Amino acid sequence: MAIKTYKPTSPGKRHQVSIKNANLAKKGPEKSLVTSLSKTGGRNNYGRITSRHIGGGHKRKYRIIDFKRNKMDIDAKVVAIEYDPNRSANIALLSYIDGEKRYILSPEGVSVGDKIVAGDNVDIQPGNCLPLANIPLGTIIHNIEMKIGKGAQIVRSAGTSAQLMAKEGDYVLVRLPSGEVRKFHRLCRACVGQVGNREYESQKLGKAGRSRWLGKRPHVRGVAMNPVDHPMGGGEGKSSGGRHPCTPWGMPTKGYKTRTNKSSDKYIVKKRS
């Protein structure tokens, strides 16, 4: 895929940068792998906002993605590469030789007609899924399980990848996109290669309206609010807020670490950079 720019026929087009999706399927999603998706507007079951700046946006259907890749040693053919509104990566529709169809995250370099398989001792090629113990050192991987059989949980965003660094007994060391080096059990599964749609990060929406189409509401600065709404609100003219940057609830922000210690910290060999 390539990047597309536009002539400045309007202020919104002037800075817009989008991705050419010539290789994506023109048809709709596979109906058997689609379910409804209701919007929350950022509210919980009490109707209170628990996640700000969420609301509106185009109606979506959820595509059921196979993160477990538990259909072992059965060849599948890539039938289509499709757009998925629920994630940054594109998805690939697989058709297995027994007739079943499943969606997976589309890896970089995989195209329509390619063969993909999951198993314990399959070839090391993009899209194939196998246990970390059977993947050679230095291999680029994505879609990694954190618990055996639970399904992939990390390295799933567009263009991301991790690298297998070492093997120590029952564990392997993997360097994640954040720079963190972490232990995973050797039987946890991962997919070979990098997640596709690398150009996603180069996009520029060009106007506020396109952000609203994605279900994002305005992110208002605290210093632009009144004192009743934010600790940094109020003041005469354009004041600086009068204190160190903080959240609406008074917690320091812009670099202040809020992560609590947890039992899984023992698997972190090197903290993220």
Curated annotation (Swiss-Prot):
InterPro entries: NA-bd_OB-fold, Rib_uL2_dom2, Ribosomal_uL2, Ribosomal_uL2_bac/org-type, Ribosomal_uL2_C, Ribosomal_uL2_CS, Ribosomal_uL2_dom3, Ribosomal_uL2_RNA-bd_dom. Pfam families: Ribosomal_L2, Ribosomal_L2_C. GO terms for molecular function: rRNA binding; structural constituent of ribosome; transferase activity. The keyword Ribosomal protein applies. GO terms for biological process: cytoplasmic translation. The keyword Transferase does not apply. Residues 222-273 are annotated as: Disordered. It comes from the Bacteria. Residues 262-273 have a biased composition (Basic and acidic residues). Keywords: Ribonucleoprotein, Ribosomal protein, RNA-binding, rRNA-binding. GO terms for cellular component: large ribosomal subunit. SMART domains: Ribosomal_L2, Ribosomal_L2_C. One of the primary rRNA binding proteins. Required for association of the 30S and 50S subunits to form the 70S ribosome, for tRNA binding and peptide bond formation. It has been suggested to have peptidyltransferase activity; this is somewhat controversial. Makes several contacts with the 16S rRNA in the 70S ribosome. Belongs to the universal ribosomal protein uL2 family. Part of the 50S ribosomal subunit. Forms a bridge to the 30S subunit in the 70S ribosome. PANTHER family: LARGE RIBOSOMAL SUBUNIT PROTEIN UL2M, RIBOSOMAL PROTEIN L2. HAMAP family: Ribosomal_uL2_B (MF_01320_B). This is Large ribosomal subunit protein uL2.
